[in-house]
Amino acid sequence: MHSLKFAKNQSKAVCDVRSYDNKDRWIILIDLTTGLFTEIDHQHDEAWIGGPGISGWNADEGTLGWLNDDQTVYFQSEKTGYSHIYLHDTARKYTWQLTEGKWEVYDIVLSKDSKSFYISANRSHPGDRNFLRVDIAAQKTDNITSKEGYHQVVLSPDEKTLAIRFSDKNTPWELYTAVNTTNTTKNRVTYSTTKEFNSYQWRKPDVVTFKGSDEKDIYARLYQPKIGSANKAAVIFVHGAGYLQNAHNYWSNYHREYMFHNLLVDNGFTVLDIDYRASEGYGRDYRTAIYRHMGGRDLQDHLDGKDYLASLGIDSTRVGIYGGSYGGFITLMAMLSTPGEFPCGAALRSVTDWAHYNHEYTSNILNYPDTDPEAYRKSSPIYFAENLQGKLLMLHGMVDDNVQFQDVVRLSQRFIELNKENWELAVFPIEAHGFKESYSWYDEYRRIYELFYTELILKSTK
């Protein structure tokens, strides 16, 4: 049960209640004078409850509150398959949907006069985040910003001015101001990049779609070398977290990898960065497609991405794969559960056995190890160690505070027991899950580059 949201007159409150298995959410109305409560909304998901603006079963609270009339409650739900705003009239006991479409609503702010919501949304393209105003009475949504990229907005107290943190694909975040009006114009305030940074022509990767083997559209970032400089080899990057978006039109959270991808392209490689199944921004079905099988549909999207690269003229026998955290896990599953698909892979800070990872994360997707052992077994790389064929590089910080170092130690021991020879482990003694030292990042990516250059270029020319 999450914290109560009180009406201004203090006579009633609402809160959301979650089942322990995270498959049900109830929003309840509490009469504070009688102590009685009634159900406003019930959401059930055979996989797990989630999505933008929707609370977790832990302390993470979602969108929930009152309009100024002390009668109308607002909340978000994935009822239609995408997270949208809903309103409930507590007097008339009536619920209606305010926003709709195949896009997601984020970061709701109620206007002072309680007549509008300000939201962030990817309505124009899954890879954009624009700032919109939703007129509650008219049920009309207008763009305040509309440019490709990400507009992270804070309203001034009088709601007349916007402070905007904006970026696009090859431009880091900068601060702008704008008037709060439809299709506003931004005024740039900061110029944060250095001469050294600006001296390099950072690429704007194309955001492309290709068809998965189930005919669903898969979004990805595509980095391509100039015609004539391509070496017909490619690298697939797997972002971390699972529920995260990286095939978008703004500056990546993976800025180091973005720079590394530019280096790869400088040397003739093509790079594909896929928003695989379970990535953020694409609705409920996309989010839950990995239920009971991590390394299933999400890994298949990378195999389909490899086929897409082949359609662009890439040699399908010269495609490597790498990623960190969840991306490292997918890399391990690619190398171990689909042997022969990739000649090489680099797995950074990877989970090797989900039964040893934190319960809060895994219980949503795989249920519990004691009640659903099959889901854990088919989703854990350590059970496929005997299948290793390609060259595998594993890299892990010894003081990892997220994916414990024991994960990579156990898989290493399993490789030793199986007499596997085509693997290496690079240990970083002072690093946790997110590396801090520049020399560690350099060492890590030097090793990864050398792996791809050796396995995809040198060996192909012998």
Where in the sequence are the language-model features?
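Multi-bladed beta-propeller domains
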Residues: M1, I30-G62, S77-E78, H88-K112, ...
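A conserved hydrophobic secondary-structure block that centers on an alpha-helix together
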Residues: M1-N9, D16
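Residue-level detector of Asp-centered blade-edge/turn motifs that repeat once per structural unit
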Residues: K8-N9, N68-D69, K112-D113, P157-D158
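Hydrophobic beta-strand positions that form the internal "hydrophobic ladder"
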Residues: K12-C15, V73-Y74, F117, L162
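Hydrophobic helix-coil surface modules that form long, contiguous segments used
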Residues: C15, K23-R25, G35-D45, Y243, ...
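Serine-hydrolase catalytic core recognition
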Residues: D16, H151-K462
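Structural motif
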Residues: N22-L29, G81-Y86, P126-L132, T171-T177
